[in-house]
Every structure is written in structure tokens, then in C-alpha cells.
Amino acid sequence: MPEPKHALPAGLTRRQALKLLGAAGLVAAGAAAGCKSPVPGADMAPSVFVAKAADYTVDLGASLRRGLAELGLGPTEIAGKRVLLKPNLVEPHAGAGHINTHPLVIQAAAEAFAALGAASVTVAEGAGHRRDSWLVLEESGLGEVLAAEGLPFCDLNTGPVHVVQNLGGVSRLGDLWLPDALARADFVVSVAKMKIHHWAGVTLSMKNLFGVMPGSIYGWPKNVLHFAGIEPSILDIAATVRPNLAIVDGIVGMDGDGPIMGDPVAAGVLVMGRSCLAVDATCCRIMGIDPAAVAYLRQADGRLGTIEAARIRQRGEDPAAVRRDFALLDYVPAHRGLRLAP
């Protein structure tokens, strides 16, 4: 883990320093709350970039910068923008790097956006299983990285919220409550982990958006969303939030009984694109999974974008060349029939 670049203020714990950074970042953002208008229409010919990364010691920043360039993202689009990075922080398991988005991926993403002239970069998450997002932040190792880089963290489970129209209309959730911090961002990035999921089949950049739903409204572990149906809720949230970019950490992913109890699997890739749906479909193919067999991806096809390989402009590595079949469990209904043909 990198050494902190800034000493902590005298008398402050790391958690207190992170909270102060978070408050300062949110004050600096300053814009009035209100949901961004969704991107009109679905991109039916999106680009997805795949980079090899053998482990977390390689130059992740170079891979992400190349990916951004391949996707046409440069200073013209990012300069002066408030960027929000939304990692996958599930459980405070120290040393279990296959559970949460790796801290060094977040660090590399923050540096890449700063280099493009972003006005600010904030890391924000509403941990799903634990009420204390700060505990998950610290034990995941991300807190140390944020403190070292002077990056603010925002707990999306608490704080002011506002109601927006549910633009998906698939579940019975009705209107959605979202954090004001999400609305203040100009550019939202879902920085997910590549994992098998016990109930949904896979959890990638779209399922990662459960973490933007405030626990103060939707409970723990976001039980309201579960009661409304995991897959319909994924579709509604993805259609409403519409992240500007998805990055999936597949350097070490999780197979088997994910998203918490599974085993680490070294897939050795970073996957990124402007369409969460196309990114997730590409990730599935890398995992040896047919995206059309994942119910919520199939339902999103044609509504939020495309899952068809022929329509996705692949950049970087060929997904077939980096395929690493993730283990599926025969006794889990959501895993049956997912395997992609050779």
C-alpha cells in the first residue's frame, strides 16, 4: 500500500481526517441537488476497452489513461468537472481483496481524472451489508489510500436525499430516493468488482449501483430493493442513475458463492466503457458466462444499450483471448445455464 503523502493533522484519527475531507469536498461541490437528466436514447454501438493487468503492482494508471483515450474521454469532457467514483465496498474484511474494489484501482482512477483536469474527485459509497461505511472503508484498505491522496469520501447511506422519477419503471419501487451528493457530481463512474452473484448471476457495474441507494431509506442490506426484486431494481436504478462511465476491477475477481463468500480468481483484466450494459456483457464473456442468460442483462438489451458482441466495438484485448471461466455452482438456481459455449 502506498505511503501517505500528507501527514494527518495533529490530534485527528484517520477516520476523523477522512470525514473532514469528505465534508470539505461536498461543500466545494456546491451545486444545488437535483438528478441529472438521463442520457437520451441507448448507445447501440458502444465501445468497451479491455486491458490486461497481471496484478495490482503493474501501472494501473497507464492502463486506465489508455482506456479513457480509447473511449474518447479527454480534457475537453473532464476539465472542471466534479467526478464521483463509486466503488464496490461490501464487507469490512481486511485482506480479502476479492470482495471489494481494490484501493489501487480507485487511486489510479482518481489520478487519471485529475490529470484530465477534473475540478474534484470524490469517492462515494453506501455499503450494503454494514451500517458503518467508515468501518468498511478502513478495513478494506481504501481509507488509507484516500487519506494518503487527500481524497474525500462520502457515505451515501446517510445525509440529505431527494426524490426523482423512476425512469426504468420495471419494479414496484415507484419514485427513487437518491443522495444529494450524487446529484452534485458532473461525472459519475461505477468502479465495480468482477464477481459471481448468488441471486443475480453476476454483479458488475450495473449491480454495483445498489450502493448509491441510501441505507437510511432502503435499509440494510438494501432490503427494500430485495423485496422489490433484485433484477427489476437493478434495471430501474441503472436507467435512472445512468453513470457516465463504468470500470470493472477484474484483476482478482470472485467466483463460486459470491458476492461475499466466493473464492478469489485471477482474471487479470480491467474493463471499461461508457455503457454499463456493454461493459457488463463484455465482462460476462471474459468470465465464461453468456450475458443473454443473465436475466437482468437480457431485459436491459435494447433498452439501456446492447449486449450483442457484434454491436460492441471492442478496444484493447479481445475478450475471447482473456477468457477465464469463473466457477458456477450447480445447486444455485441463478447459476444454472449461464455458461458461455466454448
Language-model segments: what does each one mean?
Residues 2-342:
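N-terminal and secondary-structure boundary signal
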